[in-house]
């Protein structure tokens, strides 16, 4: 029979139909090749927005720099970065007037954080520009390399010290006349293979010492490496994002700590909270505006969009904000916080890998590295690239570009939110001194503006005033992309509001399904996603039950673990059938071992092993939870793991799921091909680092881990801990006298070896 599709919506309120408009099936686009072109675009655009500023030259690096601050007031609607210092300071003063003590309290909180933060905070985070090797590395490795270089150059760096002490070293390093670093390089030799008697290329990794003079070191310390942002939907062109080096990261972290603390106290800020908490916060602002718009008043909301938020922001403006916010604070604190914006005012952008050329006729490919762009003949490039390179040439130094204005993506999200909120704050009647007034929401570059006024002219005047006020601090509301509606319907950070926030369940669709980590984690993540969507996204019981059945089906097809009594033939079915037949209690078999599914929407919170434990045969229990099983190298798992789930929009989210370690929690082995590349030395360093950390965690279980252990080294801390634990175990009779003596002997030997070293 034919179903009329409109019948589906008869009983559904219009706002719930949003989940049917989901456009993002299929994979998002990824970038290939180099990001050099995108980075040049960013640099050229940023300079264009600030072109009427003043040019100066950095005395240390010789880099030309453009300063648009206090530049000409705008005469048209073109985006521009000419923020006026006095306007920004005044906005800050009014923000403080509306929230007495907010800056003072946030400064106190931040000082406390600065005193307590350990340098290992910087190991969090993904790719980081490693200035010693001049390319990207995992954060932990980049930090270890930096500390190693600092130490060999006579600084006091310490892996377990405070972050503030590491930052003192960074400052000191900038005053040094030269820095000695160790770089990796590759040697290739042609040798004859004994077995096959063929000639093969053998690669060896060499480490060599290199001296950087002050200028070269400063350029590297101020460099942000660039890459292309991947998986961005709904865009025709890719764009560049920045990864800063270790010198900048620590300073940025403290500035963002201060700004986060301020944002937490501002009701208009969409950061740093998320999820339901964010929705509640935002709903409050809307409610306030709607209740206050008496029957005589009109209320309109703009779903706002800003033009090139980052490229029109300016680090010098952030410096002014910080100077004001910390004005009554101790000198050291003000200095620490002002370094990040100063470094950003002098930043250099690395152009990435450069361009790839290929000649179709001669079947040749060659890479033109970014360093060569300053001197290469431009006749080889097409029209648009030629224009880009010409524009950028005056700014080039050693393959990096001087980029003083602009902020690069994702660097000061919290602080720029504070700036945005300070303009929303000026919408109160006591500041507008007229019949219209405004309020709104701000989250990084995204905003929603609610304007109330007695008539349409008032609304228009309010919007105009907001627009112009923003211009004065370098915020450019896009008139083309912003949309105005009667209050009650708008969008903010992909939340859709219609008389309350609408659960847009379809946004979570990409995270349903089998993650592909391993059988154990995938089962756990799959049911947790369904559980979370029932809690947060209006996923109803019937739909959830269906989602669960689809997930189990998907899971069985992925791991070829159909029920033991099924007719489906796969590579595993022979083994699974055998297991099924010799198992007394078939309900106890995990789904991944061909067992039945016992999940329903009431027990999604229980890990499968726990759900079925009582139903399992004893020998099956023994095989399943056997840490000595030689066929499985599985990790030791804390009770909670983190999975990365991909919603359709916005960044990948981290989601906790329960992890029970079984022989199904295997880890796939690392691809061997890396061992023949220049990465090998780094891989060995990384494994060393990993081993040390794992060992340390064995001595200091998670409760005491990451607590300051004085300034003793990791080894000293572990030895003293081992002695204490051994004594306690010996006195309580858990270990014998011989064992106790042996432990003490090992400890002494370790100390002796350290002394000799």
From Swiss-Prot:
Keywords: Eukaryotic host gene expression shutoff by virus, Eukaryotic host transcription shutoff by virus, Host cytoplasm, Host gene expression shutoff by virus, Host nucleus, Host-virus interaction, Inhibition of host RNA polymerase II by virus, Nucleotide-binding, Nucleotidyltransferase, Phosphoprotein, RNA-directed RNA polymerase, Transferase, Viral RNA replication, Viral transcription. A motif (Nuclear localization signal) lies at residues 187-195, 203-216. Phosphorylated by host PRKCA. It is found in: Host nucleus; Host cytoplasm. It comes from the Viruses. One of its GO terms (molecular function) is RNA-directed RNA polymerase activity. Pfam families: Flu_PB1. Residues 286-483 form the RdRp catalytic domain. RNA-dependent RNA polymerase which is responsible for replication and transcription of virus RNA segments. The transcription of viral mRNAs occurs by a unique mechanism called cap-snatching. 5' methylated caps of cellular mRNAs are cleaved after 10-13 nucleotides by PA. In turn, these short capped RNAs are used as primers by PB1 for transcription of viral mRNAs. During virus replication, PB1 initiates RNA synthesis and copy vRNA into complementary RNA (cRNA) which in turn serves as a template for the production of more vRNAs. Influenza RNA polymerase is composed of three subunits: PB1, PB2 and PA. Interacts (via N-terminus) with PA (via C-terminus). Interacts (via C-terminus) with PB2 (via N-terminus); this interaction is essential for transcription initiation. This is RNA-directed RNA polymerase catalytic subunit. The lineage of its organism: Viruses, Riboviria, Orthornavirae, Negarnaviricota, Polyploviricotina.
């Amino acid at each position: 029979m034919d179903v009329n599709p409109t019948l589906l919506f008869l009983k559904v309120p219009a706002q719930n139909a949003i989940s049917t408009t989901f456009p993002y099936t299929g994979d998002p686009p990824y970038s290939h090749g180099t990001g050099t072109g995108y980075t040049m675009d960013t640099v050229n655009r940023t300079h264009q927005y600030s072109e009427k500023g003043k040019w100066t030259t950095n005395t240390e690096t010789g880099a030309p720099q453009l300063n648009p601050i206090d530049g000409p007031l705008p005469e048209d609607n073109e985006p521009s970065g000419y923020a006026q210092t006095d306007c920004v300071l005044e906005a800050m003063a009014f923000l403080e007037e509306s929230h007495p003590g907010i800056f003072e309290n946030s400064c106190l909180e931040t000082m406390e954080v600065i005193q307590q933060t350990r340098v290992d905070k910087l190991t969090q985070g993904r790719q980081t520009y490693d200035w010693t090797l001049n390319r990207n590395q995992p954060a932990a490795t980049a930090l270890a390399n930096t500390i190693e270089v600092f130490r060999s150059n006579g600084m006091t760096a310490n892996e377990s010290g405070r972050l503030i002490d590491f930052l003192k070293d960074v400052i000191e390093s900038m005053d040094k006349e030269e820095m000695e670093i160790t770089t990796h390089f590759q040697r290739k030799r042609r040798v004859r293979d004994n077995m096959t008697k063929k000639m093969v290329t053998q690669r060896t990794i060499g480490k060599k010492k290199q001296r950087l003079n002050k200028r070269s070191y400063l350029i590297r310390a101020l460099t942000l490496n660039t890459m292309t942002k991947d998986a961005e939907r709904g865009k025709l062109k890719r764009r560049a994002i920045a990864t800063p080096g270790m010198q900048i990261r620590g300073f940025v972290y403290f500035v963002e700590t201060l700004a986060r603390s301020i944002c937490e106290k501002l009701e208009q800020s969409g950061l740093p909270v998320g999820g339901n908490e964010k929705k509640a916060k935002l709903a409050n602002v809307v409610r306030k505006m709607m209740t206050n718009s008496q029957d005589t008043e009109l209320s309109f909301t703009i779903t706002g969009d800003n033009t090139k938020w980052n490229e029109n922001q300016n680090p010098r403006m952030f410096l002014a904000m910080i100077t004001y916010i910390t004005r009554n604070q101790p000198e050291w604190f003000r200095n620490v916080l002002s370094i990040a914006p100063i470094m950003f005012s002098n930043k250099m952008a690395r152009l990435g890998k450069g361009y790839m050329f290929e000649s179709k006729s001669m079947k040749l490919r060659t890479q033109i590295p970014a360093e060569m762009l300053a001197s290469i003949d431009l006749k080889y490039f097409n029209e648009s690239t030629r224009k880009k390179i010409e524009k950028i040439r005056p700014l080039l130094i050693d393959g990096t570009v001087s980029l003083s204005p602009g902020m690069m993506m994702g660097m000061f999200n919290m602080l720029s939110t504070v700036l945005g909120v300070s303009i929303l704050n000026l919408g109160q009647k006591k500041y507008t001194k007229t019949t219209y007034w405004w309020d709104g929401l701000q989250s990084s570059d995204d905003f929603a503006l609610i304007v109330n006024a007695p008539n349409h002219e008032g609304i228009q005047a309010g919007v105009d005033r907001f627009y112009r006020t923003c211009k004065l601090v370098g915020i450019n509301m896009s008139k083309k992309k912003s949309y105005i509606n009667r209050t009650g319907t708008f969008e903010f950070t992909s939340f859709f509001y219609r008389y309350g926030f609408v659960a847009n369940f379809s946004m979570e669709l990409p995270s349903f399904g089998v993650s592909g980590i391993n059988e154990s984690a995938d089962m756990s993540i799959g049911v947790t996603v369904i559980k979370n969507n029932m809690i947060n996204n209006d996923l109803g019981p019937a739909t959830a039950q269906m989602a669960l059945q689809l997930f189990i089906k998907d899971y069985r097809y992925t791991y070829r673990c159909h029920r033991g009594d099924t007719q489906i033939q796969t590579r595993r079915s022979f083994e699974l059938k055998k297991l099924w037949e010799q198992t007394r209690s078939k309900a106890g078999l995990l789904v991944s071992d061909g067992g039945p599914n016992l999940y329903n929407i009431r027990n999604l919170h229980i890990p499968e092993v726990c759900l079925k434990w009582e139903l399992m045969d004893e020998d099956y229990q023994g095989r399943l939870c056997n840490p000595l099983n030689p066929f499985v190298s599985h990790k030791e798992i804390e009770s909670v793991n983190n999975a990365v789930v991909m919603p359709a929009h916005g960044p990948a989210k981290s989601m906790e799921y329960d992890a029970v370690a079984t022989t199904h929690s295997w880890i796939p082995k690392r691809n061997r091909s890396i061992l023949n590349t220049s990465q090998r030395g780094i891989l060995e360093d990384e494994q060393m680092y990993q081993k040390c950390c794992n060992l340390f965690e064995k001595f200091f279980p998670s409760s005491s881990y990451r607590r300051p252990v004085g300034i003793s080294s990791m080894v000293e801390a572990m030895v003293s801990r081992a002695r204490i634990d051994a004594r306690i175990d010996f006195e309580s009779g858990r270990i014998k006298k011989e064992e106790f003596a042996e432990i003490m002997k090992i400890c002494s030997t370790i100390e002796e070896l350290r002394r000799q070293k």
